[in-house]
Amino acid sequence: MEKVDIFKDIAERTGGDIYLGVVGAVRTGKSTFIKKFMELVVLPNISNEADRARAQDELPQSAAGKTIMTTEPKFVPNQAMSVHVSDGLDVNIRLVDCVGYTVPGAKGYEDENGPRMINTPWYEEPIPFHEAAEIGTRKVIQEHSTIGVVITTDGTIGDIARSDYIEAEERVIEELKEVGKPFIMVINSVRPYHPETEAMRQDLSEKYDIPVLAMSVESMRESDVLSVLREALYEFPVLEVNVNLPSWVMVLKENHWLRESYQESVKETVKDIKRLRDVDRVVGQFSEFEFIESAGLAGIELGQGVAEIDLYAPDHLYDQILKEVVGVEIRGRDHLLELMQDFAHAKTEYDQVSDALKMVKQTGYGIAAPALADMSLDEPEIIRQGSRFGVRLKAVAPSIHMIKVDVESEFAPIIGTEKQSEELVRYLMQDFEDDPLSIWNSDIFGRSLSSIVREGIQAKLSLMPENARYKLKETLERIINEGSGGLIAIIL
C-alpha cells in the first residue's frame, strides 16, 4: 500500500484528523518514537517554514538510561499541524506523549519527599506520578486520539529487564480495550529480527489479540512508520460487509432450502467480524459449510470500512438443484436442451392463460384474451349506406373462458352400529390436528380416502353431456358478440 493511500484511508476513517496517542510503560521509547515519527513523515511535509521550526522546537527530549524523561503529558506539536500529503489530501496530525506507567528499576517518579507530583492539563493541582499515568492514558486515548500506539520493549534497549515491564504493559492494554479505540503495539528492540524477538512478537499478538510490530525505534525509517499506520488501519471497525452469493443461488425462491442455508451461514459467520483485520479470518470459516466450495475476499475499502466477500458453490450442487427444480435427472447437454424446448413451449402456452387462471381463482370466472397470432381476418368487403360506401373488416379470434365450479363428492358408508361409526370418525380425525392433509391417506375398505373422493368427483365431471357443453359455449358466444347481458337458463 502506497504512503498516500495509507494517509488517505486513515483520514477518511478519522475525519481528516490523525491523532496518535503514544502510551505504555516508562523507559520504553515513547518519546523517541514520537520524535522519529515527526522527523520522518510530519516535518518534511510542513510547507510553512515558521510552522516547521515551531514543530521542531516542540519535539520531546529522549535519552538512554533508567531516568524517566517525560514527566508530564505533552502534545506534539502543541496545536494539530496541517500536513500536505499529496494533491487534494491534507491531514491534521498531532501526537500525544503520555506519562508512562511506572516499572521497577526506573528512576525519577519519586523524590526525597515521596511520590513525585506532576502537573497535567486535566487538573489544576499537581497529582502523583503513577496517578497521572493511569488518568493520562485513558484521557489521551479517549479524548485526544484517533489511534493508539502502545510502546513496549524486550529489555534490550536499556538496563531494565523485560519481566519488569509486563505488569505495566497489561494494565495499559486493559485500559485501551475498555476505551474501544483502535490501537496496535510496537516492541522496541535493538534486535527486531532476532528469532527470540519474533517469538515474543507472536506471543504478545496472540495474548492481546492485536497487531504487534517489532522494530528499533531509534533507527526507525519511514517504511516502519507507514507499517505502524497500516496495521492501525486494520484495527478500525468494519461498518459494512457485503456477501455475494453464487448468481444461480440468488435466482432461487426466497424460501428455497439452499438459499436459506446460504443466508444462515452468512448471518452466523459475519457476526464475528468486528475489525477490518477479522475479515480474512472469517473468509476462511465459510469453507466449513458443505454447500460452500470456497470463499474469497473480493475487495475491501479501508477508508470506508466496507468489505466484500464472494461465495462459490460446488458444481455437483448445481446439478442437484437443477434436478430438484426440473423434476427429472439431467442426462447431458442434449437432454437439457430438449427439456428447455419443451418448457419454453409450455411457458408460451401458460403465459396466454396465466392471467385468466389468477382471475378464475379470485372471482370464479376468468378470460384469456387471444394473441395476435390467433386472430384471423376475413377478406375486406365493400359496403354501401345510401350514397356512401365503406369497407367492412371482420376479424375472428378465439378467447378462452374459465369457470370455477365447486364439485361436491359425498361418501357415506353404512358400517354397522353407532359405536363402530364413532370409532371410524375417531380413526379419521386422530392425526388431523397435527397434519390436516394426513386424513386423505386414511385407509377405508382397502382404499385411501383421497382415491375414493377423487373417483366421485371425476364421475360427476364426466356426467356433463356433450350437447350441454356445446350449448354453453354457444350461449357465451352470443352474450359476448351481441352484447346481451340477459340470460335465462332452464336446467332439465
UniProtKB/Swiss-Prot annotation:
Q: Which residues bind ATP?
A: 24-31
Q: What else is known?
A: Present in an increased level in yabG mutant spores.
Note the effect listed for residue 30 to A: 20-fold reduction in sporulation efficiency. Largely enriched at the forespore periphery, although some localization to the cytosol. Binding of ATP reduced over 23-fold. Leads to diminished ATP hydrolysis
Protein's recorded name: Stage IV sporulation protein A
Q: Which SUPFAM superfamilies match?
A: P-loop containing nucleoside triphosphate hydrolases (SSF52540)
Explain the purpose of this protein: ATPase. Has a role at an early stage in the morphogenesis of the spore coat outer layers. Its ATP hydrolysis is required for proper assembly of the spore coat. Forms a basement layer around the outside surface of the forespore and self-assembles irreversibly into higher order structures by binding and hydrolyzing ATP thus creating a durable and stable platform upon which thereafter morphogenesis of the coat can take place. Required for proper localization of spore coat protein CotE and sporulation-specific proteins including SpoVM.
Q: What's the impact of mutating residue 59 to P?
A: Spores form largely normal coats and possess at least some cortex, but cannot remain dehydrated after mother cell lysis
- Keywords in alphabetical order, please: ATP-binding, Cytoplasm, Hydrolase, Nucleotide-binding, Sporulation
Asked if Flavoprotein is a keyword of the record, the answer is: no
Q: What post-translational modification does the entry describe?
A: Seems to be cleaved by the YabG protease.
Q: What is the effect of changing residue 486 to V?
A: Causes little impairment of sporulation
GO terms of molecular function: ATP binding; ATP hydrolysis activity
Mutation: residue 256 to P; reported impact is:
Defective in germination
- Which species is the source of this protein? Bacillus subtilis (strain 168)
